[in-house]
Design a protein with these regions (language model features):
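Mature catalytic core of soluble alpha/beta enzymes
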Residues: 1-372
Length: 372
């Protein structure tokens, strides 16, 4: 997702302001959850020096530390985290934090709501399609991993959790950022910060007025990436890399003449006070020796990357965790099922982009969308 700035309309839950309001703005950029993150927050000023900046600095420091706290608690690759200990307990019960129990319960909820298309227990299968390894697993490897993953969801007690078998593993990578983004928003609001932009590696929450705007407007403009342009760019990068590896050497003119596609958003949404989360086939993928692209969104029914007609599924919701829990499932469903499914959930809106570039939307978001 790309954020473009505009001026939001007045929100009855917040103090009203003039269109020419001035803001004290602070931001924090950091690396967490294996991705780049950024939190920006603002306080309206009267154009004079105040202590607003000091408050923003402290609030943002606390927000970043909150993110690091959850990463330490839930990273499946971090030795000693609740999830690491659970995955290495050989099927034995392990003590866990109360919030770990909570997010595991929420994971079970989304698993049930999506008929198993969102499932944290699919970690053994997802690991086979690791885009960093760039290796296509054999059918036998996939079936064995599926057998392990299908043994079931963790058993959750008040302060303990237990995986069904010694080989079982889970990962909260598909839901943790949504949960954490919601906690960050709560923390900001507790300090009476009502204007903010939270971006946890693509889990985006917009709060209040778009304080970064140079020209006052009424709403945030949120750009949805075009899968076609991203895939074209990746293809160009692969071709350039192949030339560089050629035993005949690299012809600088050939690389220089390769024009990168102009990456314009597929559409722009005019929004206020919501979460925007996208699942896509183009962000984490690799190309095999035959030129086939394999992405990281695994269909639990097959153990292979989703083969639906969708290239991306964007969920607009009040809670970021809903965006996490449903966007992956919608992408796997395909455009027809996903659109009808989202229409049946009043708390969700969706923008679905097919592999050939067609845009489908739910009825509630149509007035907010502007195609490019």
């Amino acid at each position: 997702m790309n954020i473009r700035n505009a001026q939001s309309e007045n929100n009855p839950l917040k103090p009203t302001t003039s269109e020419n309001a001035e803001f004290e703005v602070r931001s924090r950029s950091f690396f967490a959850f294996n991705t780049n993150c950024c939190i920006k927050a603002a306080i309206e000023t009267d154009g004079v020096q105040s202590s607003s900046g000091q408050l923003l600095e402290k609030v943002l420091d606390d927000a970043v530390n909150l993110c690091f706290h959850y990463e330490k608690l839930w990273s499946h690759t971090r030795e000693g985290s609740d999830i690491w200990r659970l995955n290495h307990a050989q099927g034995e019960a392990v003590p866990i934090d109360t919030e770990t129990a909570k997010i595991l319960q929420l994971s079970r909820h989304y698993r049930e709501e999506t008929a198993g298309l969102f499932d944290v227990s699919m970690a053994p299968v997802a690991e086979l399609w690791n885009f960093r390894k760039g290796r296509v697993p054999s059918p036998g490897e996939v079936q064995l991993a599926l057998k392990v993953a299908r043994t079931g969801h963790p058993r959750i007690m008040e302060d303990h959790a237990q995986l069904p078998t010694a080989e079982s593993r889970i990962s909260l990578g598909g839901i943790a950022k949504g949960y954490i983004a919601d906690r960050v928003v709560e923390a900001l609001k507790s300090h009476r910060i009502h204007d903010a932009l939270v971006n946890l590696g693509g889990n985006i929450v917009i709060m209040g007025r778009p304080f970064l705007a140079k020209i006052p407007q009424q709403q945030w403009n949120v750009g949805v990436r075009s899968p076609k342009h991203v895939l074209q760019r990746k293809e160009a990068e692969e071709q350039a890399a192949a030339i560089a590896r050629s035993p005949h050497g690299t012809d600088p003119r050939a690389l220089g003449n390769r024009k990168q596609p102009n990456e314009e958003p597929a559409c722009i949404l005019k929004l206020n006070d919501c979460s925007i989360v996208t699942s896509s086939i183009y962000e984490r993928c690799f190309t095999d020796e035959h030129g086939n692209i394999h992405h990281h969104i695994v269909d639990p029914r097959t153990g292979r990357p989703s083969e639906s007609d969708l290239a991306s599924a964007t969920v607009i919701s009040k809670r970021s965790i809903d965006g996490d829990g449903f966007s992956t499932a919608l992408l796997i469903m395909g455009s027809y099922w996903a659109k009808n499914y989202a229409e049946g959930h009043p708390d969700l809106e969706a923008v679905l982009i097919t592999r050939d570039g067609r845009i489908e939307t739910t009825s509630g978001i149509r007035k907010a969308i502007r195609a490019r």
